[in-house]
């Protein structure tokens, strides 16, 4: 892939790209605070607008960043839908055993801390696949959305497009994992 430099006036990115990344950063934490889902919608709309404007003006770097932002929101939504579909599928596969259903109802009505609920849910016979799928899809949604956002921000700092960031993308992944695993440990 061609490495686009953003040092000349034809390839500089404007403040709207930075605003898009700020919205994506907020959207990355939408599973903790559902109100932040609106930031994803705003980032999507802003990304489409910026992409159209960049295409009109022939600004390749800005176009690449706007496309990266749009793709990040759509990827997050796709991961959420696939995760929910998998959870529904595994839950259907578990069946509707009355004892299991009564235990699930008891857990969902409880006021225990989330980690305790997860431990009790894990103890239900046949629920391990569902717990693994729920935790895995949630972690993938949280980490991958934040990783792409941080990769975009790091690419702005390095003056390249997000896709041509190189080995620094691993730093974005490491930061995303540390943030998304660290926040629940602090909050829970």
Where are the model-predicted features located?
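Alpha-helical membrane insertion/targeting regions
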Residues: 2-188
């Amino acid at each position: 892939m061609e490495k686009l430099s953003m040092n000349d006036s034809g390839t500089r990115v404007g403040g709207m790209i930075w605003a898009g990344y700020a919205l994506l950063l907020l959207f990355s934490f939408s599973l903790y605070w559902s109100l932040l889902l609106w930031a994803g919608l705003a980032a999507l709309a802003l990304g489409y607008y910026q992409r159209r404007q960049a295409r009109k003006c022939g600004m390749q770097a800005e176009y690449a960043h706007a496309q990266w932002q749009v793709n990040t929101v759509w990827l997050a939504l796709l991961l959420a839908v696939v995760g929910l579909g998998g959870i529904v599928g595994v839950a259907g596969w578990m069946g509707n055993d009355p004892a299991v259903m009564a235990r699930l109802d008891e857990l969902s009505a409880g006021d225990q801390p989330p980690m305790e609920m997860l431990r009790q849910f894990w103890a239900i016979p046949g629920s391990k696949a569902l717990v693994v799928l729920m935790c895995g899809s949630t972690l993938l949604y949280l980490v991958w959305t934040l990783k792409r956002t941080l990769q975009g921000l790091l690419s702005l700092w390095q003056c390249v497009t997000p896709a041509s960031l190189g080995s620094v993308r691993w730093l974005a992944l490491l930061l995303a994992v540390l943030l998304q695993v660290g926040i629940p440990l602090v909050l829970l």
